[in-house]
A protein has these predicted regions:
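Helix-adjacent hinge/juxtasegments
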Residues: 54-89
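Short loop/helix-cap segments at secondary-structure boundaries that form the rim of catalytic
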Residues: 141-147
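Short, well-structured N-terminal submotif of metal-dependent ribonuclease cores
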Residues: 1-43, 50-68, 149, 153-163
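Aromatic- and histidine-enriched alpha-helix N-cap/loop-to-helix transition segments
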Residues: 39-45, 108-112
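Active-site neighborhoods of divalent-metal-dependent phosphate/nucleic-acid chemistry enzymes
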Residues: 79-139
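A general alpha-helix detector
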Residues: 46-50, 96-97
Length: 163
């Protein structure tokens, strides 16, 4: 049986979708072969900033920079990557996000991603349809797993069937 699940892409995975790096193959193959991707608005902004840093430091050309940022924005704008996050601008949400950040020594962007998976739009889905975090960040993957979130480190191996 095939289960529907949402795959949340963190900033590191988003960057690998649009910038040629030596370890981008697994995530790109997976992205082009399946559906139901999401990211928080903050992760998308973080990814755009990371692409800018690569351009600013001469690691990619101006042409590559604009192609990468255009690709990210169009994928979000067109719905290929759904923008989904809990409202960070409420006392309860901020407290929840800060708590996750402090517990796992994460920044707000990473902890917002975890809080969104735990409390957001798709949090109610049953065990076989539970959302998955797609990341190239080992520390974030470990934090997600300790919170009961399934995580796939997209630079270590191809996607398993449960992703």
């Amino acid at each position: 049986m095939l289960w529907v699940k949402v795959r949340y892409l963190d900033a590191s995975a988003l960057v690998k979708l649009v910038v040629d790096e030596g370890d981008h193959d697994y995530v790109r193959q997976f992205y082009h072969s399946t559906t139901n991707f999401a990211a928080t608005s903050l992760c998308l902004a973080e990814a755009l900033g990371a692409v800018k840093a690569k351009w600013s430091h001469g690691r990619i050309s101006e042409e590559q920079y604009f192609a990468a940022t255009r690709n990210l924005v169009i994928n979000a704008w067109g719905g290929r990557i759904e923008i989904d996050d809990i409202n960070l601008f409420t006392p309860q949400s901020l407290s929840s996000v800060e708590s996750l950040a402090k517990r796992h020594s994460l920044d707000l962007s990473d902890s917002l991603q975890l809080a969104t998976i735990l409390q957001g739009k798709y949090a109610h889905l049953g065990p076989n349809s539970a959302s998955v975090l797609v990341t190239a960040d080992r520390k974030l993957a470990m934090a997600a797993e300790s919170e009961g979130i399934r995580a796939w480190n997209c630079i270590l191996s191809p996607a398993a069937a449960w992703v």
